[in-house]
């Protein structure tokens, strides 16, 4: 049995928990689809999820996490901020754009109030340099995972 476990492993598990307490959640349009009766049963819910995962999530969310991680590993804060700006400008739905920004700012706020041993200063540099911008959740997450 291990007596000493790296605390950062638990933090990584915690931030990947769907119930991570960032005090904000969002349906990302599912509510509207239900209200308009476009998602009304198991089959239409499956199609909605499949479409969302194979388009928006894959080419926007996952790609931005990957790019933020890569830029952070190269200490390229300007590149990270550029990804945030591109994401903010490319989300056509105001509702989804604001959700991403709120999730990002609350994610950052929660992490800053947590005692974390970072392996580098990339996340804290990103937070300081993105104060005048609107950080997105996926970019903040990617930079945090690299840090």
What do these predicted regions represent?
Residues 6, 17, 41-43, 84, ...:
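Acidic-enriched, low-complexity/disordered segments with a strong bias for Aspartate over Glutamate
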Residues 10-77:
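Glycine/small-residue-rich interface belts in oligomeric ring/scaffold proteins
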Residues 2-9:
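Membrane-interface "cap" regions at the ends of multi-pass membrane proteins
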Residues 62, 67, 74-146:
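Internal, conserved structured core segments that host functional sites
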């Amino acid at each position: 049995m291990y007596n000493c476990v790296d605390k950062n492993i638990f933090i990584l598990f915690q931030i990947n928990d769907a119930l991570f307490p960032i005090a904000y959640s969002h349906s990302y349009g599912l509510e509207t689809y239900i209200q308009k009766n476009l998602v009304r049963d198991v089959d239409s819910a499956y199609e909605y999820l499949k479409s969302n995962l194979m388009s928006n999530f894959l080419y926007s969310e996952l790609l931005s996490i990957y790019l933020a991680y890569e830029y952070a590993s190269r200490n390229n804060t300007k590149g990270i901020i550029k990804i945030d700006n591109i994401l903010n400008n490319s989300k056509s739905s105001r509702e989804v754009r604001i959700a991403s920004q709120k999730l990002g700012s609350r994610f950052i706020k929660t992490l800053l109030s947590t005692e974390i041993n970072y392996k580098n200063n990339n996340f804290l540099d990103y937070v300081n340099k993105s104060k005048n911008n609107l950080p997105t959740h996926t970019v903040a997450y990617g930079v945090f995972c690299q840090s």
